[in-house]
Amino acid sequence: MPIITKISTQKRKGRYNIFIDNEYAFSVSERTLAEKRLLKGTELSLEDIEKIKKAEADSHALQLAMSYLSYQPRSVYEVLTYLNKQGISPEASQSAIENLIELNYLDDNNFARLFIQNNLRVGKDGPRSISSKLKQKGVANDIIQDSLYEVDDEEWIEAGMRLIHSIGHQVGKMSYKEIKQKALKKLQTHGFNQELGELVVDQLDLESTEDDQLEALKKQGIKAWRRYRRDDDFKRRQKVKRYLFQHGFSSGEIDSFLSGEVVNLEEIDEY
């Protein structure tokens, strides 16, 4: 039966080299050395050696995983992916995952809730974007949906307002309609559906006077009038009309600009 003939320390603290029948066999941690009572002269069967190697592999995988988790919460899938990249065997990785779940260090339900709450506190993503990100982290869809269901609309509105609050500063520069359209579009690209997006937009401070709308019409109108100055008068007016309509101004407002009621069009051409 194989016999341990030598045990030497490695440069790496807490690691030991095991020699069997005067040849290097494997290395172990100080914990394994003590738990398995590995001493010079100890006889080991081939089965014993395999059990020791497995225990070492499992222990190494667990330590790597715990170190990875020390920086921030992770999903089960993220930890498995990390261990795989570190060259850990599937068996050792699975053993580490099972241990971490038992120790409550890994829990996709808690992970999903923490991920969502962090976004609600400092992020700007809506439900769809968060759902997509959690799926990329390997969280099951039913866990994601259950976690999202726990969030009130008011909390989503706060996150949405962080995303679009600067758009509210465009009063007097863009039409009310364009401001709302721009805000809704931005919300939708960040995962807010139409209904939730409208709830967010309703919180924007868009209270203004007719003078603000008139100022926005003036700025956008002058911009368009100058842009199409190379066209003949008919085409120029048609293009300006289309431009202002696309920017949320009503037909009446557009007509008032083109008739010269807002600003003298001839004076614009002089500059």
Curated annotation (Swiss-Prot):
> Which protein, by its recorded name, is this?
Regulatory protein RecX
Read off the InterPro entries from this record: RecX_HTH_1st (IPR053926), RecX_HTH_2nd (IPR053924), RecX_HTH_3rd (IPR053925), Regulatory_RecX (IPR003783), WH-like_DNA-bd_sf (IPR036388)
Location(s), subcellular: Cytoplasm
Say if the entry is tagged with keyword Nuclease.
Answer: no
Per the similarity annotation, which family is this? Belongs to the RecX family.
Keyword list (alphabetical) reads: Cytoplasm
Q: Which GO terms describe its biological process?
A: regulation of DNA repair
Q: Classify the main location.
A: cytoplasm
